[in-house]
Amino acid sequence: MSRKSRAKPYSPFRYFNSPPEVIREVVMLYVRFPLSLRNVEDILLQRGFDFCHETVRLWWNRFGPMFASEIRRKRVSPMRNFSRWRWHLDEMYVKINGEMRYLWRAVDHEGEILESYVTKKRDKKAALAFMKKARKRHGPADAIITDGLRSYPAAMRDLGNIDRREMGRWLNNRAENSHLPFRRRERAMIRFRRMKTLQKFASVHANVSNHFNHERHLVDRQTFKERRSAALAEWQSLAC
């Protein structure tokens, strides 16, 4: 038998003493819920695991983007086949060291967070970069709903899809409401200190939120429980 055939398959957990299922649960708790690093540390202690809060920080930084990338890869392809795909675009301000920065988000008609993008300004250049990134990953949308920010039509003219723009009162509530879970999470983290950290966490948070979005308000209790169990089982199989 050759040395190559005897080699063990690569595991991202190989240099960690803790079980992979514990690491996955720690990342899920910290990213999904509005908990601080020390909150997660206390929850784990009640379950019999004595970890420092800095271990929680290390694990989410190391494995959060990896898990998010795998989730996104599984979800992007089916979404490209949607008929009458509608995007809702909106931007929210985030303070970093006292300076205003902007987090752009694209949400589809079913509440899926498609893209998160951080910029220093919200001008045409920023809007164009954001929309190009979203279109490159997800393909074109049949309709794009925005607010009255003039950067959107300016960027859409360059992209040649200004005819697909829709704007009106209450039309963009889906995008605006999608900011609320992130705002709660932001307060628990006591703000961000760097744009790079904000971009990283916003991307990971969006994909984890998508994975555990069971549309609870649209289905009965039994269907919700089945979807929740399936999502948890799939989460525990990430990076295997």
Where are these regions (language model features)?
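Residue-level recognition of single "structural anchor" positions
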Residues: 1-240
